[in-house]
């Protein structure tokens, strides 16, 4: 077991995380803390970090080092970004950090900051072509991603804290100040013509992006509190922008979903996002909950556990298997076996359910994690599993797809009308998705029944779709007792006919082949 800590000292806040990596290579976040230190506050007249800002940061870092020692962390990796990078006294501050805390604080270049942010995103969100913006207090890193690789990146010298300090002279922006700031942001972005009219979705990381998602979720009474991979269209973002701009500081502090410690700088942050929307000419914003500090982790993990490859190929399977690695070997084998059977049936029955490949990935997620609820309680484990699936670090599928996967887990054990009413994530699914979910739930249930005894003795399935029936030939290892399995599958015949409008016929055949 190994514990690794990462510290991300930004211009507005400093974040501290601890990951635990097991001998099997599975990992989990075990601690996280954030302090608002505003390191870049009031530095733009002199281009020097102020004594007060440095002292706030040093106190926070000292506390994090104490926590790392208390939790027996093996290694600490600490990085600083734009504020330290641009300050005349940045080197002196790094020296003070070493003297006061013992930390070796590394000031990373804008390109490295963009790369680490990219790693945090690409290993946790399943987009291929998009534009990342990491909006911080003193800079905004913008990265063009195509086919899951960086094409171009730039560090823009505009951030929520520095723009506020430069253009807002009183408690509120005057119309003229707001106009000047907007023009400055527009001018800075337009210097990079490769962004113009590219029409790819924006993917935002950083506090401003997360607050946009929180505000929108509260307005919609969104059933999932997860911010990562949350998507909203431009018109809803623009409503938030206009609402925020029309309120005083005290009124902004009361906006549901907006952190009170960000209320004074949020207008500048939203202005940057708005101008990116306009210049890129896109209508979609995806919010990422994983950024630079997760990038630090994946950089380390790839180097030490993945043979130097820090970009994970299939993030859905990887993240699901990471959850599964906390299970016993027996549970892991069963979960993978169920998933294989379920996808075999899914492919064979495609003429009947007519679902696209995205729903196949949902079935994979549901199959791998179908028994995860048993870690809470065997009884009602489907309901527990539903909640855990939605709230686990499962990457590569959208919120709707995650809710759909959770529905499969819950419904595969029989979801009564009363239970469906309390299925919190049901409002994310439309009627067509719910009807499809009922069909795929039966497929998952049959796959579970086929390994009812957890012996993995079924070697092959052959499916024949007829006019009034579906015939499944089950080839199992010679000499095995299939009575329990037969009973479990037969119980699903009625549900199968209800959903697929055909009778289910199972033929059992002994197979002499072990492979």
Q: Where are these predicted regions, by residue range?
A:
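N-terminal glycine/serine-rich phosphate-binding loop of ATP-dependent small-molecule kinases
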Residues: 1-5, 9, 14, 19-80, ...
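Short glycine-aspartate micro-motif
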Residues: 4-8, 130-134, 202
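Helical "lid/coupling" subdomains associated with nucleotide-phosphate turnover
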Residues: 18, 42-67, 81-88, 101-123, ...
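Short, surface-exposed alpha-helical segments at coil->helix boundaries
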Residues: 87-94, 486, 490
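Short secondary-structure junctions
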Residues: 452-457, 498-502
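A short interface-forming secondary-structure element
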Residues: 472-487
